[in-house]
Amino acid sequence: MLIIDGKKTAQDIRAELATEVTAATAEGRRAPGLAVILVGEDPASQVYVRNKEKACTEVGITSFAYRLPAETGQQELLDLIAECNARPDVDGILLQLPLPRGLDAQACLLAIDPAKDVDGFHPENVGRLSLGLPGFVSCTPAGVMELLRRYNLPTRGKKAVVVGRSDIVGKPLALLLTRSGEFGDATVTICHSRTPDLAEECRKADFLFLAVGRPRLITGDMVRQGAVVIDVGINRSDDGLCGDADYESVSKKAAAITPVPGGVGPMTIAMLLVNTVQSWRQRTA
């Protein structure tokens, strides 16, 4: 059984990006820049932002941190986004979600320049994904696809089941899996809370993608022998972090599986860095 190591893969990606950025700055080009906007003092968001800033430093990306109080008004936040849109040294803008109550997250995401939307949340980038056009892809599904490529797990002609239909993971992942190519061309089923027989659908999957946020929802008896299981879920339980899969029983059936932690999670930040460097390449070419 193959354990798909997202932590090691993310380290490899950061090293590759660092080599590129170091070479470019040695030639006199400016470093990539990422604006990180955090509103309020949500503890989890603060941890996420620190991790992203640390990863930026490791790669050579300049991180512009904006930490705003929870009382920040909508217009003040929109003005800051407009300022970041206009800054030539900012290649990507990351608005840490969730926002405090009273702020319209959708309006703020709409205000971000799609060319700097390295989170891939802007409707223009979502539309580009659905049409198969170039654009920024949401970091978690992009990380999943990168793991499939780097571990040479092609989905062409396979049956893929995505459990979860969120706008951030489930839906974009399903779109990526249906794109033409060796790591696409899958026949995709999306399951959710209203799916009549989830176990039956999961057992049909050659590739099973879990992104529902329910600890150990999927057990070994729900998985086909030899399936590839990609567990996007990160849940807190009495005995620590766990995924949407019951790892102990599912790993006995799977041909390959991502652990939690150490699977998809590290890839999300890695792909944020990839998107930022991609924007920088385009803007400094």
UniProtKB/Swiss-Prot annotation:
It catalyses: (6R)-5,10-methylene-5,6,7,8-tetrahydrofolate + NADP(+) = (6R)-5,10-methenyltetrahydrofolate + NADPH; (6R)-5,10-methenyltetrahydrofolate + H2O = (6R)-10-formyltetrahydrofolate + H(+). It comes from the Bacteria. One of its GO terms (molecular function) is methenyltetrahydrofolate cyclohydrolase activity. GO terms for cellular component: cytosol. Its EC number is 1.5.1.5, 3.5.4.9. Pathway: One-carbon metabolism; tetrahydrofolate interconversion. Catalyzes the oxidation of 5,10-methylenetetrahydrofolate to 5,10-methenyltetrahydrofolate and then the hydrolysis of 5,10-methenyltetrahydrofolate to 10-formyltetrahydrofolate. Belongs to the tetrahydrofolate dehydrogenase/cyclohydrolase family. NCBIfam families: PRK10792.1, PRK14184.1, PRK14186.1. Homodimer. PANTHER family: C-1-TETRAHYDROFOLATE SYNTHASE, CYTOPLASMIC, C-1-TETRAHYDROFOLATE SYNTHASE, CYTOPLASMIC-RELATED. This is Bifunctional protein FolD. It comes from Desulfovibrio desulfuricans (strain ATCC 27774 / DSM 6949 / MB). The lineage of its organism: Bacteria, Pseudomonadati, Thermodesulfobacteriota, Desulfovibrionia, Desulfovibrionales.
